[in-house]
Structures are given as C-alpha cells and as structure tokens.
Regions:
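Double-stranded beta-helix
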Residues: 2-9, 81, 85-117
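A short glycine-rich, His/Asp/Glu-containing loop-to-beta-strand
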Residues: 3-40, 44-45
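Glycine- and acidic-residue-biased ligand/ion/polar-headgroup-sensing regions
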Residues: 43-56, 60-61
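Short acidic-glycine-tyrosine-enriched beta hairpin
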Residues: 61-79
C-alpha cells in the first residue's frame, strides 16, 4: 500500500505524487544539513531529478554535485544516498520495479540509527 500525503522523516519529508502498475513517483525534500541513509533496493530502480536546492548525490562510490536539473539513475542493488548542503534539496523520484514499498530499503549506514539488526 502506498502512503499518501506528506510523510515526515528525520531528514525531511516525502510524498507520493503518482503511481501505476510498475511505477511510483515521489517528491522528496531533504532539509539543509541532512542526508538519506546509505541504502540499496533489491526490487526497484530509481531515477532522481533534482528540481531545486543543492547538495550531493552518491551512487556506487561516485559523488556528484546536485542542483536543479541534475539527474541520476540508480540501478537495482546500487548503493546510494542524497544529501542537502546549505539549502533544502528537492528531488522528484521515479521508482520502477515489481515491489515498490518502503520495505525494500536495506540501510547500510544511517545518521538517525534506523538500521535493522
């Protein structure tokens, strides 16, 4: 089941803005000075499009500067994260795959101690 409305997280918030068979579209706001957990997904790929703000996007050990217009394709199983620097980072995330839920997150490192034992 897809969560609707704004969902608060320690790093900011997200909301689902569209969904259909095999895809889910979210808007993520990572607050200045915060970052997502270092994570990977087994059942989906993600395509990130930065729409405002600045920060860094990491994928498989490479880091790129993020600003409006920056895009990143995160393949199935790729280790990745996004971080906001001095201003909020707004990302539109398109997920594609067979299992599109918050259960498909394997956290490898997390600033907010949300890793499962």
């Amino acid at each position: 089941m897809t969560e609707t409305g704004i969902v608060q997280r320690p790093w900011g918030w997200f909301e689902t803005i569209g969904a259909g068979e095999g895809y889910l579209v979210k808007r993520l706001c990572i607050e200045a000075g915060h970052r997502l957990s270092l994570q990977r997904h087994r059942h989906r790929l993600e395509h990130w499009v930065v729409v405002s703000g600045s920060g860094q996007l990491e994928c498989e050990g490479s880091t790129i500067h993020a600003e409006a217009g920056t895009t990143l394709l995160v393949p199935h199983g790729a280790v990745h994260r996004a971080a906001a620097t001095t201003e909020n980072l707004l990302i539109v995330e398109v997920q594609r795959g067979e299992h599109l839920s918050e259960d498909d997150i394997e956290r490898l490192a997390d600033d907010y101690e949300r890793m499962k034992c």
